[in-house]
Design a protein with these regions (language model features):
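Alpha/beta catalytic cores of group-transfer enzymes, especially the acyltransferase/condensing modules
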Residues: 1-90, 94-98, 155
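Acyltransferase/transacylase module recognition
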Residues: 66-158
Length: 158
């Protein structure tokens, strides 16, 4: 079993699955002149049907939880858009075994008028994907106190 697990940006996909199947896809990509094929060190076949058991476990766990009305919209990257409150448990349950539509999510945000994105966490990988999707987006990265202060100043126009 192998499937596309992440649609990052134009020209970049991530596949995941059983090790041998992933190796076969890697070989096929290279044979068909893929510009670059990189093996990622992950701890599991995330966002694939191989995580169905984890998805079912989440479903059972969520039956014990109370979900409240969202105060701000959340774009679920399994769908690439917002959802209704009552769908949250089902979407979260499916998220572990469904592909991530990062590019679709960013394009949806742009269609909603978003022109600034702040990446929080180490590195600038997601910002690089956003640049490949739409170079007009203003990007900031926060990974420590210094970059937080710099971003706050920039957003205040200082």
């Amino acid at each position: 079993v192998v499937s596309i697990s992440i649609y990052n940006c134009p020209g970049q996909l991530v596949v995941a699955g059983e090790k041998k199947a992933v190796e076969n896809v890697k070989e096929l990509a290279l044979e068909n002149k893929a510009r670059r094929v990189i093996s990622l060190n992950t701890s599991g076949p995330f966002h694939t049907s191989l995580l169905k058991e984890a998805s079912l476990a989440l479903k059972e766990r969520f039956k014990k939880e109370t979900f409240h009305e969202m105060k701000i919209p959340v774009i679920f990257n399994t769908l690439g858009h917002e959802i209704e409150d009552q769908s949250i448990p089902e979407i979260l349950e499916k998220q572990v075994m469904s592909p991530v539509y990062f590019e679709k999510s960013i394009r949806y945000m742009i269609d909603q008028g978003v022109d600034t994105i702040i990446e929080v966490g180490p590195g600038k990988v997601l910002s690089g994907f956003v640049r490949k999707i739409d170079r007009s987006i203003q990007l900031y990265q926060i990974e420590d106190m210094e970059s937080l202060k710099k971003t706050v100043k920039a957003l205040k126009g200082e």
